[in-house]
A protein has these predicted regions:
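ABC ATP-binding cassette signature C-motif
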Residues: 1-185
């Protein structure tokens, strides 16, 4: 079971196979983010265990917009993360996520919520992984960016575990739904 001091959810048996697309649904405060944090190892399970294959490579997109150095620009952040890429390659990666040169050179803490979310998503989508865990990735995004994200996730060959309140975002491509509401007594 997962939680902080007391269980938020009962014991759960969840197996995510390679390439499967899952969505976790439930009302605010039910434990969706706590479940994700337990799955990635940020929180220990209160009871039971989380088993991961050695080949598992997780990319986690948190709904919180925090940065190691909020005064750093997106371009500097990407340069730190990908030191072998040229400035031109980094600008191209950012441009693919609709992050203009002007936005890419501003301090991260001066960007709007939507702009920061685009930087975080762009960073997450560059990482090599076989499981994407996304906590409310559509929050702060305009419709164009949501559409582009949806298309990118549909093309992603690895497994996805998504927390999202927008059924129209995942309705046509997610294969499995875990409704936490049905688990709570």
């Amino acid at each position: 079971s997962v939680g902080y001091e007391r269980p938020l959810l009962p014991e759960l048996d969840l197996k995510i196979q390679a390439g499967e697309k899952w969505v976790v649904t439930g009302f605010n405060g039910i434990g969706k983010t706590t479940l994700l944090k337990t799955l990635i190892g940020e929180l220990p399970p209160l009871q039971g265990s989380v088993c991961r294959f050695e080949t598992l490579r997780i990319t986690y997109f948190s709904q919180t917009l925090s940065w190691p150095d909020p005064k750093q620009s997106a371009l500097a952040l990407f340069s730190d993360c990908y030191p072998r890429k040229t400035l031109q390659e980094l600008r191209f990666l950012l441009a693919q996520c609709r992050i203009s040169h002007e936005l890419a050179t501003r301090p991260l803490d001066t960007l709007s919520g939507g702009e920061q979310a685009r930087v975080k998503l762009c960073l997450a989508l560059q990482q090599e992984s076989n499981l994407l865990i996304l906590d409310e990735p559509t929050q702060h995004l305009d419709e164009w960016v949501k559409k582009a994200l949806k298309e990118a996730l549909q093309r992603y060959s690895g497994a996805i575990l998504l927390v999202c309140h927008e059924a129209d975002f995942y309705a046509n491509w997610v294969e499995h739904q875990l409704s936490l509401r049905s688990l709570v007594r």
